[in-house]
Amino acid sequence: EDEDANCGIMLKVARKCYLPMNALLLKLIRKYDGRFKVSFSISGTALDQFEAYAPEVIQSFRELVATGCVELLSETYNHSLAFLYSPEEFREQVALHDERIEALFGVTPRVFRNTELIYNNDLARAVEAMGYKAVLAEGADHVLGWRSPNFVYRPAGCDRLKLLLKNYRLSDDIAFRFSNHQWPEFPLTADKFSEWAHAANASGDLINLFMDYETFGEHQWESTGIFAFMEALPEVMLRTPGF
């Protein structure tokens, strides 16, 4: 393992993404007095890297969690696909991850996110048996068919577990298309995105936006306007009562 490379990459991404975006989210949470909330799924491996090379990132996440407006999700410690190979190993990794979250942040995850949103109904039943109240999954067209990802579902064979699906179109508009000058909708503004989100949610329960955190500052550099976009987005989204 190349410790120097690990350290260099972590410091670069912390400087470009984690620290400035966490600071922005903290500012927005305080500004909107509890109306703006976010969730994070942080693997144990990432937490290990933060502690080793950029402990200030851990502290910035602690400040966010302390607001009561940030939820930390459960996942496998090593961001692995253990469930597909060994249910026992899967349970051990998830328990280890939750213990780490509790030790660092003083909260117990209640919602599960499998690596890369990989999902099947067997996973859902296992997650329900482990005591979680919801599981996240990809809102894949070939699975949904005519259905919309903008509703809360209950997985087959589960009694209580809620299934929350990613709206990949709206998520990818930010994560992948935001700075693409060839995209017909470029530039993406907060007002434009808000219109799309409200239109998509006209007959739905919710809209789940899931994306890599490195979207902000690393994949989409600060010079693209991604931070300014995110700073403006809550205000225009929250203009609609009840949203």
Language-model features: locations:
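Catalytic alpha-helical scaffold of carbohydrate-active enzymes acting on polysaccharides/glycoconjugates
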Residues: 1-111, 117-173, 179, 187-204, ...
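Polyanion-engaging groove/track-forming segments
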Residues: 207-220, 224
